[in-house]
Design a protein with these regions (language model features):
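Catalytic active-site module of serine/aspartate enzymes centered on a nucleophile-bearing elbow/loop
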Residues: 162-179
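Gly/Ala-rich beta-loop-alpha elbow adjacent to hydrolase catalytic centers
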Residues: 74-82
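Short beta-strand/loop motif that positions the catalytic acidic residue
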Residues: 122-124, 128
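Active-site catalytic motif of lipid deacylating hydrolases and related acyltransferases
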Residues: 15-68
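Catalytic histidine-centered segment of alpha/beta-hydrolase-like enzymes
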Residues: 154-163
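Conserved alpha/beta-hydrolase "acid-adjacent" motif
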Residues: 129-135
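Short glycine-rich catalytic loops that host catalytic nucleophiles or stabilize transition states
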Residues: 48, 149-155
Length: 179
């Protein structure tokens, strides 16, 4: 198998944490981000989700049943799913990494009663016309007490910024992961 320049496989185990990538609405685990993670972090869990938000959440709940110490990476609609899962199961989640999350699509108020304190890193392109960054930031700031929000020079797909992030750092707990 040929690797793209600059992409290397992570050779060492990353502890007992369970890393999960959740794709967006019109994507799959075989999209650009899923392929990146599959190549570099073969132990990362991925699944394909279909249907409405609630149908997808049922699929995600089943996929993650019995797992703990989760680091959830959610892209767009997958970011919304990751946030909802964390609201419902905060003790199981160690960290969230949200990529242009579609947080404004539903009223998250019914899913949480108090702010969540797990570390959350949010990247959002300032040129995103699919999911405007400022409303997503406002929702995230209400839900997550430990939020590191990064607006970046990119669009919704984050194709320029995504591969340059310090994923080794982001996927370890307690590290910011910013280059």
């Amino acid at each position: 198998m040929r690797r793209k320049a600059g992409v290397r496989k992570r050779e060492t185990a990353m502890g007992d944490l369970t890393r999960v990538f959740i794709h967006g609405l019109d994507s799959s685990s075989r999209g650009t981000k899923g392929s990146f993670f599959r190549e570099r972090y073969p132990e990362m869990l991925m699944n394909d989700y279909f249907g409405t938000l609630e149908e997808r959440m049922i699929q995600l709940e089943a996929f993650l049943a019995g797992r703990k110490d989760l680091i959830l990476i959610g892209s767009s609609f997958g970011g919304l799913m990751a946030a909802l899962f964390a609201c419902r199961h905060e003790p199981l989640v160690r960290r969230l990494i949200l990529l242009a999350p579609a947080l404004g699509l539903v009223d998250l108020g019914e899913y949480y009663s108090k702010p969540l304190f797990l570390p959350v890193t949010l990247y959002h392109g300032i040129n995103d016309v699919v999911v405007p960054p400022e409303p997503a930031r406002r929702v995230a700031a209400r839900i997550f007490a430990n939020l590191d929000c990064r607006f970046v020079e990119d669009d919704h797909d984050l194709h320029r910024v995504f591969p340059t992030l310090d994923w080794d750092g982001l996927l370890e707990t307690g590290k910011s992961g910013h280059s």
